[in-house]
Amino acid sequence: SIKNRTWLIDPSLIEEIIDMSDGYTVLPEVKGAGEEIATQFLVDLKYAIGDDPVYALPYGSPKIATRKKFSDVEFSQLQSVSSVRLARALGRAVTAGAPPNWIETPQKLSSMNISEFRTLRKELALISQVSSDLVISETAIRLNTLLNPALDKKSSQYLAVSFTGAVNRLAEKLRVLPGRYTLTSREEKVPVTIVNDFDAPAQVVLTL
């Protein structure tokens, strides 16, 4: 048997495998062939882990040094969320963050990925100021995948397009319908129509 073995696991990987094990389809409507393989993988993984210590990598395996540069507070929150989700996925206790004395492997990260992450992160932050809908925070968590240095160019481009579309759709969920108003004094009641397609309430401050 192997002793003193430590596991570092990205919760996004396990969640994707769990989704596969629940059944999936490949466009247009062909049933995926990996359902049984995914189910068996989860069984084998839990058996292999046994009582070994498990550490949760940040969701999406972003380059830690780069992610922390954006915000230490956000990174701490990401570590906490990642450990909770991995523990739920594996059905056992895990530790947030990397084990002691663990050193991140030096890997170059695409400047395009960093730029895309910076832009989309900023847009999500603005959207989150008016709505606390869970889909916003979920998108923000998944966005960290863009900072994964293991992504090849094709995967990076696909994710960038996918996340850009997702963030744009979120931005379109909250909008003010256009109208023409005549203001005759400093204080007026203006009939403004605001459309909120989020499930959660939104708080909007309009400045004229």
Which residues fall in each region the model found?
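N-terminal membrane-targeting/anchoring modules of bacterial envelope and secretion proteins
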Residues: 1-208
